Regions:
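Conserved lysine of the Walker
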Residues: 10
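A glycine- and Lys/Arg-enriched "phosphate-lid" helix/loop adjacent to the NTP-binding pocket
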Residues: 91-158
Length: 196
């Protein structure tokens, strides 16, 4: 699973990592969250500002529900024959729908079923600063999600760090990347961990 702030390069790195598996004739399925299912589509509408914004707790439940559907409908069936590489998973839920230790613990609880059903072998956090992520988002020139402001990215980065600290004893989460690393260099760093 690939995690990181908006603008960190997650989507590009996810694509390149899936291609790396294919280069080595290793079957790979690439996916993402929120999904294109009914719940994921609602989430995307909210994030784009097309739908009214829900409370953080309601959003956390929506993401967790979308994840359960994703696990049952896509991830588990593909794991039978493939490596699955996913752009976002439950760490994003923890980072984006929490604002302190108490709310982080709540989001962890909402994701307990997902954690039981499908715990990743590796979770990679692409560690790019909020300031650099914001520069990249601005450079894209696309419309921004509700989380794509520098102030919001700083909060989300702090929550990612809190989630990683909380889960490091039970999850195999690895920080990779930096502001100056290219997506290919980040994939090379990930590949070293995967092939150990």
């Amino acid at each position: 699973m690939i995690e990181g702030l908006d603008g960190s390069g997650k989507t590009t790195v996810t694509k390149l990592l899936a291609e790396r598996f294919t280069e080595y004739d290793l079957p790979c399925y690439r996916t993402f969250e929120p999904t294109n299912g009914a719940i994921g589509t609602l989430i995307r509408s909210i994030l784009s500002g097309k739908e009214e914004r829900f409370t953080n707790a309601a959003m956390a439940h929506l993401f967790a529900a979308d994840r359960i559907e994703h696990i049952h409908n896509e991830i588990v069936p593909h794991l039978m024959y493939n490596t699955v590489v996913c752009d976002r998973y439950y760490y994003s839920n923890m980072a984006y729908q929490s604002f302190d230790d108490e709310s982080l613990e709540s989001v962890v609880q909402y994701n307990k079923d997902a954690m039981k059903l499908c715990k990743p072998d590796f979770t990679f956090f692409i560690d790019v600063t909020p300031e650099e992520c914001m520069k990249r988002i601005e450079k894209r020139g696309e419309s921004k999600s509700i989380y794509e402001t520098e102030a919001e990215l700083k909060i989300r980065y702090a929550q990612f760090m809190a989630a990683i600290k909380l889960m490091k004893e039970t999850d195999n989460i690895i920080n990779v990347g930096s502001n100056s690393m290219s997506p290919k260099e980040i994939v090379n760093q990930m590949w070293e961990h995967i092939t150990k």
